């Protein structure tokens, strides 16, 4: 197993005493899931995690369980694909001019 991230996040601090605290996992080893391409950037995943935690704290929601690793990876893939599509559209529009 990988070591936990060294960067403290708000989610880690909130869940420091619970069993849901973040642990870095090797998805291939733990779940035998083939990874088709590179994982999302760790800084992007941390940013999504921090934003979601701050949003839940601000709105009074207590569902920190929804911030598990697979949800964060899924959101990371989604944001990465969305950004790639935006850049591609901008480049195509620029080439047309």
Swiss-Prot record:
It is found in: Cytoplasm; Nucleus, Nucleolus. InterPro entries: Rrn10. Pfam families: UAF_Rrn10. Its main location: cytoplasm. GO terms for cellular component: cytosol; nucleus; RNA polymerase I upstream activating factor complex. GO terms for biological process: transcription initiation at RNA polymerase I promoter. Keywords: Cytoplasm, Nucleus, Transcription, Transcription regulation. Component of the UAF (upstream activation factor) complex which interacts with the upstream element of the RNA polymerase I promoter and forms a stable preinitiation complex. UAF seems to stimulate basal transcription to a fully activated level. Component of the UAF (upstream activation factor) complex which consists of spp27/uaf30, rrn5, rrn10, and histones H3 and H4. Interacts with rrn5 and spp27/uaf30. This is RNA polymerase I-specific transcription initiation factor rrn10. It comes from Schizosaccharomyces pombe (strain 972 / ATCC 24843).
């Amino acid at each position: 197993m990988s070591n936990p991230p060294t960067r403290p996040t708000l989610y880690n601090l909130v869940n420091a005493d619970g069993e849901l605290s973040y642990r870095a996992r090797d998805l291939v080893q733990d779940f035998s899931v083939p990874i088709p391409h590179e994982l999302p950037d760790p800084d992007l995943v941390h940013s999504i995690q921090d934003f979601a935690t701050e949003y839940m704290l601000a709105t009074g929601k207590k569902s920190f369980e929804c911030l598990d690793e697979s949800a964060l990876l899924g959101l990371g893939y989604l944001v990465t694909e969305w950004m790639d599509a935006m850049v591609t559209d901008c480049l195509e529009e620029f080439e047309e001019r």
